[in-house]
Amino acid sequence: DTLFIFISDNGTSRLITSRMNGVEVPGSKGLTHDAGHHVPFVAQWPGKIERGSLNMDLVDFNDFFPTLLDVAGIEKPDDLLLDGKSLVPLLKGQDIAHKDSVFIHYDPQWFAMVPSRYEFDKRWKLYYDGRFFDTNNDIRELSPLDITALDVRAQAAYDKLKQRLDSHGGKLSATKSHLELGISSVLE
């Protein structure tokens, strides 16, 4: 009756190159494209999850705390605000709409990485600076689409992601990392 979850928090080191579907995929830990954040998520829950089942819905780490509350039978306090949703219905194979896009606020404080914000769905990705990608055809995000020349489908996706990205508010920190700023400025 125990739920086992295996997941990683990021892609592989940039020193590692893997192969997927006959294509070389360089490690992308710390980067914001697919190989940097699309990671395996494997779950086993005897009697609850059908053996061999596969689900390609979008999930993110915000979903794990509500999931663990749900599995443990703990009611979420009304004053506790959570962005995530329980994955229990998905794990049990229920056909529900979970998420059709995910928001990421990437603001690394530990290394010389550039902060970023973006919203993505299963095909499209929009960054706060306006870069827009068809990730089905450009998984490494090398060629941003010209947003003045989008077809109807791409324009609809852009509009949806732009509205959602803008709705999150907030701002990014300075582009200098704490390593560049020095430890004393971090502690002040």
Describe the function of each predicted region.
Residues 1-17:
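Metal-dependent active-site segment of extracytoplasmic phospho-/sulfohydrolases and closely related
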Residues 3-8, 40-42, 64-69:
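Beta-strand elements within well-structured catalytic alpha/beta cores of enzymes
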Residues 52-54, 147-150:
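Second-shell loop/turn segments in exported
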Residues 150-176:
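Charge-dense polyanion-binding interfaces
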